[in-house]
Swiss-Prot record:
Its main location: endoplasmic reticulum. It comes from Arabidopsis thaliana. Residues 1-55 are cytoplasmic. The gene is P4H11. Fe cation binds at H197, D199, H261. The chain crosses the membrane at residues 56-80. This is Probable prolyl 4-hydroxylase 11. The keyword Endoplasmic reticulum applies. Belongs to the P4HA family.
């Protein structure tokens, strides 16, 4: 599943960044006239999740991350609605990519039943159709051997659960709900794939929510990303309930070439 947003939200993001307050590290921000004026030396920031969760996510998401800034955040305690701990993991700085573990609510931990994941799958199944790619010349969608999955869209605000998820995505990304696209559910059967590509130029960020588990394959791959120890290429393994956020544009509005991504073949089971 994925959800993307338009470039028109850049001004909103800058406005939110200007209002950012991290009291324990007031010397961290020297100038916030533009995104690329954040910090000049390495700083590690720890905050109390109850008070500054949103500020921390905003700082980690919007800072250029081409500097030596390092972000860290304490885990969110388990609760009845979210019996597993929820926490944010920085995957790579180029592109800016993060995984929010246990993003979707798990109601019955013992039975491994994830109501939000299963609910979205049940809404999507009746209307699934072959996925398409946009023709660069005509602008129209067409089937392609580069994308062999199937998918469908879920109307915004379809029901209470969909509304809650859309609200959570907005809070996670600090992007207004009205600037996001409708939820799109994608299904990859065994052997299906989506070859590396760039998201449309009208998008600045994408959130991929994993609705199911697979034993082998199905990773989201960033072939041009800068990984650990300068190794080229990063992959994210799907885990039911997790959400992957990555930014297709740099803070200055230019396209990030390292945001090129694809989906590996599923070698066992189906992936939503």
């Amino acid at each position: 599943m994925s959800k993307s947003t338009s470039v028109s939200t850049i001004l909103y993001l800058r406005q939110r960044l200007q209002g950012l307050k991290i009291y324990e590290t007031s010397d961290l921000i020297q100038h916030i006239n533009t995104f690329d004026e954040l910090v000049g030396e390495q700083v590690s920031v720890d905050v109390k999740i109850e008070e500054k969760t949103k500020d921390m996510i905003l700082l980690c998401s919007l800072s250029p991350l081409l500097t030596t800034l390092t972000c860290s955040m304490v885990k969110v305690a388990a609760s009845l609605r979210f019996p597993n701990e929820r926490w944010l993991e920085v995957i790579t700085k180029e592109p800016r990519a993060f995984v929010y573990h246990n993003f979707l609510a798990l109601f019955f931990k013992i039975c491994k039943t994830n109501e939000e994941c299963d609910h979205l799958i049940s809404l999507a199944k009746p209307s699934m159709a072959r996925s398409k790619v946009r023709n660069a010349l005509t602008g129209l969608g067409e089937e392609s051997s580069s994308r062999t999955s199937s998918g469908t869209f879920i109307r915004s605000g379809h029901d209470k659960i969909v509304k809650e998820i859309e609200k959570r995505i907005s809070e996670f990304t600090f992007i207004p709900q009205e600037n996001g696209e409708t939820l799109q559910v994608i299904n990859y059967e065994v052997g299906q794939k989506f070859e590396p590509h760039f998201d449309g130029f009208q998008r600045i960020a994408t959130v991929l929510m994993y609705l199911s588990d697979v034993d082998k394959g199905g990773e989201t791959v960033f072939p041009e990303a800068k990984g650990i120890k300068s190794k080229k290429g990063v992959s994210v393994r799907p885990k039911k309930g997790d959400a992957l956020l990555f930014w297709s544009m740099r803070p200055d509005g230019s396209r990030d070439p390292s945001s090129k991504h694809g989906k590996r073949h599923c070698l066992s089971l189906n992936l939503f």
